[in-house]
Curated annotation (Swiss-Prot):
SMART domains: RAB, RAN, RAS, RHO. It comes from the Eukaryota. A lipid is attached at C203, C205 (S-geranylgeranyl cysteine). Changing N125I: Constitutively in the GDP-bound conformation. Mislocalizes to the cytoplasm. Caused severe defects in conidiation and pathogenicity. Coiled coil: none annotated. This is Ypt/Rab-type GTPase ypt7. It comes from Pyricularia oryzae (strain 70-15 / ATCC MYA-4617 / FGSC 8958) (Rice blast fungus). The modification Cysteine methyl ester is found at C205. Keywords: GTP-binding, Lipoprotein, Methylation, Nucleotide-binding, Prenylation, Vacuole. A motif (Effector region) lies at residues 37-45.
Amino acid sequence: MSSRKKVLLKVIILGDSGVGKTSLMNQYVNKKFSASYKATIGADFLTREVLVDDRQVTMQLWDTAGQERFQSLGVAFYRGADCCVLVFDVNNSKSFDALDSWRDEFLIQASPRDPDNFPFVVLGNKIDVEESKRVISTKRAMTFCQSKGGIPYFETSAKEAINVEQAFEVIARNALAQEESEEFSGDFQDPINIHIDNDRDGCAC
């Protein structure tokens, strides 16, 4: 299996500004946490080599500015994604309410071949904050995920490295499954299109 080619997995991380997207990425890739990250401008990415079911893969994690007007990044930013991670702050109801619009935005821009089965993962971040300040319960978050077809849900703390590794293991596994299904589908896509074009040419003659 070691002779199989390496795979690049593109993972898009979406969510409101301040929910901890950059912190989660840095905790996962660099095992570091800083309380003084500057707001991400546009988009940035980090990579990490991981082993998923005996496959050597490179995770390319894309962090975005959590602003509604970053469509200027364009379709190219979303296209080719193998998994989308939706992040909210369990202490901020607005960031939770925005998950639907982030999910819709991704599906519109990325235009995955099979949107109903495209892999999403939801992360409820900042669980290190004292329980009394928490506003989004585990039950409420899980209900949302179930309503969207059973999206995997993890409660994380980038600050204390809680569940970060476990969440990204599932993200990597789901992204790899998506990448492999896209490769399989792609084997048939071009011949079908060429056949249609040839038929049209024949009719024109």
